[in-house]
Amino acid sequence: MDSVAFEDVAVNFTQEEWALLGPSQKSLYRNVMQETIRNLDCIEMKWEDQNIGDQCQNAKRNLRSHTCEIKDDSQCGETFGQIPDSIVNKNTPRVNPCDSGECGEVVLGHSSLNCNIRVDTGHKSCEHQEYGEKPYTHKQRGKAISHQHSFQTHERPPTGKKPFDCKECAKTFSSLGNLRRHMAAHHGDGPYKCKLCGKAFVWPSLFHLHERTHTGEKPYECKQCSKAFPFYSSYLRHERIHTGEKAYECKQCSKAFPDYSTYLRHERTHTGEKPYKCTQCGKAFSCYYYTRLHERTHTGEQPYACKQCGKTFYHHTSFRRHMIRHTGDGPHKCKICGKGFDCPSSVRNHETTHTGEKPYECKQCGKVLSHSSSFRSHMITHTGDGPQKCKICGKAFGCPSLFQRHERTHTGEKPYQCKQCGKAFSLAGSLRRHEATHTGVKPYKCQCGKAFSDLSSFQNHETTHTGEKPYECKECGKAFSCFKYLSQHKRTHTVEKPYECKTCRKAFSHFSNLKVHERIHSGEKPYECKECGKAFSWLTCLLRHERIHTGEKPYECLQCGKAFTRSRFLRGHEKTHTGEKLYECKECGKALSSLRSLHRHKRTHWKDTL
């Protein structure tokens, strides 16, 4: 049998890591060790250089002393073990304790795995002999250890250093065994594979923990505030919020932290160390988690999907915030409408929808924004100093995903296809809005009862109630409820028409107008009435047509209550109340309230000429 090194199978826990293990994980560790000792008692094996009898007795004593919980007064907290059944059944472990009060380090592992194992069928029971010489002494503790490999492992100082680096993602590990198990996740060759995302795991316990990211299971509940968590380590970190415990203090600035990983991340703010690099663009990060999030901007991976509206997210925190929008049950409540949010800043941002406050104003175009982050992203479009620059039009973007979306306006690429009808879209959001026409799901409901399939349409609709038009054209003073409409209107002044039809060379100020125009040449009519089968080139025409069947008249006059199928008809009607007459006949100077009335009036002049 080939020899197996200790590092091949060891799982090393620092004191901090051991403290984060759940009761079930510690119980699993204890059960594995007990099963190992039972195997040692009965199997017919002997070791080349060690006698198994004393090892059995030593392991039993050590297990009773050290595997239940870490004692602050007798252990430094580093354990070596957590050996899976498959390895336990093949190799008999050796357990070396360090009993000194200074160290108390537990060396629970397969120290004899460097030796070859022989099965001797001639022996019916374990032989019991005294241990031989213990030539290896720990430099710091002065403890004698009988096996060289145990000494080498024990000698490693518990400084939290992780000398084994993953070449694929730069994550570091304290042992070679941990690194190899991590590499299995990259190569997808672990025996436990997630059916939802395909991620592979070597350990069933890690696989079950991962499954909770999909199922949403949260078995650990805080007794003080009832908040639940999917992982025991997350639960312990949360408990420290209540206790105020911050055991890890920065030596440079004295700032304290509740957990070791946060402390390490903070230390890098002083050293400037950024050990984790993006393999695609080379950008460096101080934390591996941030590297993973960043890499998704290149791959487009969005593993968290909302079941209500289909929106997807790069990371779980954004997904959680989004879900609160649907449920409205966040811990921080709006004083005006009672809606709940996940954090105080979100409440403040929401309250601006009631007050209309938009403190961030762009001095170049007059656009006002509610949030500083939106303002910074917007300014990049003017300054052109964003890291992502379009080679065709020179427009700059601060975010790779926004840049990729913009590129599609030039290439015409439509990577998002509807599975039901095959229609393709350039944006994932456009696909979600389209899919709602099939499913009929409209999760965003207005107080007036009208529902919408997407948030932007809902927000635009809300301005029809408030009458708010914060976006004003500096050329003519015309105001708009949405910045998009102002941008489109501005092009009527500048005559900027960057989008040209390849068939007739007609130019348009907006890309969507070009796409609609192209249907004149292609004859495409993608919008079909379900009642009568009549097809239309534009969605607005279909919606207007459907009102013939439904009898719906959504535009109502506030003064007399008369309703109309189209907003244009309502505007014309309202002039009968105000007396406003904008349309003047050039023949006789008569003023009329609507264009239709003007055309009818002109016919009276034509009759006179005839």
Curated annotation (Swiss-Prot):
One of its GO terms (biological process) is regulation of transcription by RNA polymerase II. Residues 4-97 form the KRAB domain. A zinc finger (C2H2-type) spans 164-186, 192-214, 220-242, 248-270, 276-298, 304-326, 332-354, 360-382, 388-410, 416-438, 444-465, 471-493, 499-521, 527-549, 555-577, 583-605. One of its GO terms (molecular function) is zinc ion binding. GO terms for cellular component: nucleus. The keyword Metal-binding applies. Pfam families: KRAB, zf-C2H2, zf-C2H2_6. InterPro entries: KRAB, KRAB_dom_sf, Znf_C2H2_sf, Znf_C2H2_type. This is Zinc finger protein 823. It comes from Homo sapiens (Human). It is found in: Nucleus. Keywords: DNA-binding, Metal-binding, Nucleus, Repeat, Transcription, Transcription regulation, Zinc, Zinc-finger. Belongs to the krueppel C2H2-type zinc-finger protein family. Its main location: nucleus. The keyword Phosphoprotein does not apply. The gene is ZNF823.
